[in-house]
Amino acid sequence: MMINIRRSRHEEGEKLIAIWRRSVDATHDFLSNAYRAELEELVSDFLPEAPLWVAVTDQDEPVGFMLLTGEHMDALFIDPDVRGQGIGKMLVEHALTLAPGLTTNVNEQNTQAVGFYKKMGFKVTGRSEVDDLGKPYPLLNLIYP
């Protein structure tokens, strides 16, 4: 499968929300149902308007996306149906061309993502007991050396 990376388009907001939903359901089983619903509401409002980088197939079908703010990767979500095919790696490598000192945060309980970032060469620089919304889901702070 050929993958290209491009900017997101407003009209594909629903597809990107669906990728977020399926990715979270596949990797974030530690979230409470109530908090998962709260996050989905926030994401549903935010994603269609966000300046995302999207990984698309040669049919221009989104299969993953990343949000980059300056040198910080705020989000990386891959459709679970295509995980393990290097799409996350491609998006991170794209981010590194734009922000060589890339940082990100990852839920400590998301062991698949923690392993992915460590394999990519990221180093842990710190830890927070709470997530960005102050909930008790610890975050690891990572940087690409």
UniProtKB/Swiss-Prot annotation:
Locate the transmembrane regions by residue number. none
Q: What is its EC number?
A: 2.3.1.-
Q: Give one Pfam hit by family name.
A: Acetyltransf_10
Q: Which residues form the N-acetyltransferase domain?
A: 3-144
MF annotations from Gene Ontology: protein-lysine-acetyltransferase activity
Gene3D superfamilies (alphabetical):
3.40.630.30
Superkingdom of the source species: Bacteria
Keywords tagged on the record = Acyltransferase, Transferase
CDD domains from the xrefs?
NAT_SF
The chemistry this enzyme catalyses reads: L-lysyl-[protein] + acetyl-CoA = N(6)-acetyl-L-lysyl-[protein] + CoA + H(+)
EC top class named in words: transferase
Function per UniProt: N-epsilon-lysine acetyltransferase that catalyzes acetylation of a large number of proteins.
So what family is this one in? Belongs to the acetyltransferase family.
| Protein name in the entry | Peptidyl-lysine N-acetyltransferase YjaB
Which species does this protein come from? Salmonella typhimurium (strain LT2 / SGSC1412 / ATCC 700720)
